């Protein structure tokens, strides 16, 4: 069994793979105050709940965009799972060509997404990851990762409105009754959801001009389904794309 761990700014996502099959998955809140012992005990508990023990683990593959938590999770894996995790970083085998000007600055999650898409769907493709930040990633037919675009995620934008506009409330992201909000909550929901959908449609159109008409559009992340319900430009939704990418990266760097 392979344990994959994706450390994001909002969530820590884990997947347990039996071969290519995602056997179990979990999504935890990212907690900057949590110590290695707490992470380790939690990981042990998750394995137990999945009816597995440490003896069943054959490897751990980890990607992180939160440097201050990486060391804690690595320590937790060493001390509580008795295993040194494989950390996605510059210099590992990816099977794709990273054309970013500074490859070291590309988030490990973006590389994992690109690898998963290239191996599972092929290019050209635009991969949209709806997380704390929403990223658009461009992959050519030849398997080149070109880069992409980064913008604030929907929830981050909603929180910014609440934090910086005195009279605007904190809201749940739901579909309003109409594009024209008749109260403040519905107006905010309209602006956030439909405005975001329009942004996605516009970005996809611009990416397609660069990558060609055969470009696939694949979405992942917690809000992918919410956005996809409002537009036809998203062709494939893969909730656990990043974890799939980590599994593939593990296999590429640990051949049988």
Predicted regions and their residues:
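Short glycine-rich, Thr/Ser-proximal phosphate-binding strand/loop in the N-terminal lobe
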Residues: 2-45, 143-170, 174-175
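Residue-level signal for inorganic ion chemistry
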Residues: 14, 62, 131, 161, ...
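Short beta-strand-loop/turn "lid" adjacent to the catalytic site in phosphate-handling enzymes
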Residues: 50-105, 142-148, 153-154, 182-193, ...
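Phosphate-binding/catalytic loop of phosphoryl-transfer enzymes
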Residues: 83-86, 92, 96-164, 194-204, ...
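Short glycine-aspartate micro-motif
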Residues: 2-6, 61, 125-129, 218
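A short acidic, often aromatic-flanked loop/helix-cap motif at beta-alpha or helix-coil junctions
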Residues: 33-34, 92-95, 241-245
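ATP-binding/phosphotransfer module of carbohydrate and carboxylate kinases, centering on a glycine-rich
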Residues: 2-4, 30, 158-256
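Phosphate/pyrophosphate-binding loops at sites that engage ATP/ADP/AMP, CoA/4′-phosphopantetheine
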Residues: 43-59, 203-215
């Amino acid at each position: 069994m392979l344990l994959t761990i994706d450390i994001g700014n909002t969530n820590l996502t884990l997947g347990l793979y039996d071969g290519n099959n995602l056997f179990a998955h979990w999504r935890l809140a990212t907690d900057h105050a949590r110590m290695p012992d707490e992470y380790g005990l939690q990981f042990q508990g998750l394995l137990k709940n999945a009816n597995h023990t440490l003896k069943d683990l054959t490897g751990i593959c980890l990607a992180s965009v939160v440097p201050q938590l990486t060391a804690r999770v690595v320590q937790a894996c060493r001390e509580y799972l008795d295993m040194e995790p494989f950390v996605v970083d510059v210099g590992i085998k990816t099977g794709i060509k990273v054309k970013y000007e500074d490859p070291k600055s590309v988030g490990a999650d973006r590389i994992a997404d690109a690898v998963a898409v290239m191996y599972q769907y092929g290019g050209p493709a635009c991969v949209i990851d709806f997380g704390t930040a929403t990223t658009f990633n461009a992959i050519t037919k030849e398997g080149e990762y070109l880069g992409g675009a980064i913008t604030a995620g929907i929830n981050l934008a909603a929180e910014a409105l609440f934090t910086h506009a005195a009279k605007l409330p904190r809201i749940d992201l739901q579909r309003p009754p109409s594009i024209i909000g008749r109260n403040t909550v519905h107006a905010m929901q309209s602006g956030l959801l439909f405005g975001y959908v329009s942004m996605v449609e516009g970005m996809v159109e611009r990416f397609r001009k660069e990558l060609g008409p055969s470009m696939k559009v694949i979405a992942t992340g917690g809000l992918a389904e919410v956005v996809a319900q409002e537009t036809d430009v998203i062709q494939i939704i893969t909730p656990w794309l990043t974890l799939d990418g980590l599994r593939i990266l593990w296999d590429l760097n640990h051949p049988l």
